[in-house]
UniProtKB/Swiss-Prot annotation:
Gene label: lspA
Active site: 111, 129
Naturally occurring in which organism (per UniProt): Bacillus cytotoxicus (strain DSM 22905 / CIP 110041 / 391-98 / NVH 391-98)
Chief location: membrane
Reaction it catalyzes: Release of signal peptides from bacterial membrane prolipoproteins. Hydrolyzes -Xaa-Yaa-Zaa-|-(S,diacylglyceryl)Cys-, in which Xaa is hydrophobic (preferably Leu), and Yaa (Ala or Ser) and Zaa (Gly or Ala) have small, neutral side chains
InterPro entries: Peptidase_A8
Function: This protein specifically catalyzes the removal of signal peptides from prolipoproteins.
Name of this chain's protein: Lipoprotein signal peptidase
Subcellular location per the Swiss-Prot or TrEMBL entry: Cell membrane
Pathway entry: Protein modification; lipoprotein biosynthesis (signal peptide cleavage)
GO molecular function terms noted in the UniProt entry: aspartic-type endopeptidase activity
Listed GO biological process terms: proteolysis
GO cellular component labels: plasma membrane
Superkingdom to which the source organism belongs: Bacteria
Length: 152
């Protein structure tokens, strides 16, 4: 299915970008892309967003394996007839596996996209995180659209 190719694309871009950061930037180094808005910052995270559950790799291994299994099951069962759901799940699957690869082989996740939103210093994130978030937002949009259709 095409949705697995979306996941593979996300994994490839995610891992390539992380490899580039690790090989070419010192930890903590930052390159401004748009001053006071967007930076490429070499950062490592041993937990989830905002450092939640730091150094609890066993927890992330278990949760990710279960989550990936659920996503694959859901893709096989429902994505065949629902294009937007398939794209969403492909993005989520790719993001989950991208960060899982880091946790297994590095014992930490490489983050590098650093954004300041209205002067708020948002936590540094990566391509996998972005794919996960976009996938979730697409599912929310689809759910809202389906709810609207049911009312009509």
């Amino acid at each position: 299915m095409i949705y697995y190719l979306i996941a593979l694309f996300v994994i490839a871009i995610d891992q390539l970008s992380k490899w580039f950061i690790v090989k070419n930037m010192e930890l903590g180094a930052s390159i401004p892309i748009i001053d006071n808005v967007l930076y490429i910052t070499s950062h490592r995270n041993r937990g989830a967003a905002w450092g939640i559950l730091e150094n609890k790799m066993w927890f992330f291994y278990i949760i990710t394996v279960v989550f990936v299994g659920f996503i694959v099951f859901y893709m096989k069962k429902y994505a065949k007839t629902d294009k937007l759901l398939g794209i969403s799940l492909g993005l989520i699957l790719g993001g989950a596996i991208g960060n899982f690869i880091d946790r297994v082989f590095r014992q930490e996740v490489v983050d590098f996209i650093h954004v300041y939103i209205f002067s708020y210093n948002y936590p540094v994130f990566n391509i996998a995180d972005s794919a996960l978030c976009i996938g979730v937002v697409l599912i929310i949009i689809q759910t809202l659209l389906e709810g609207k259709k049911m009312k009509e």
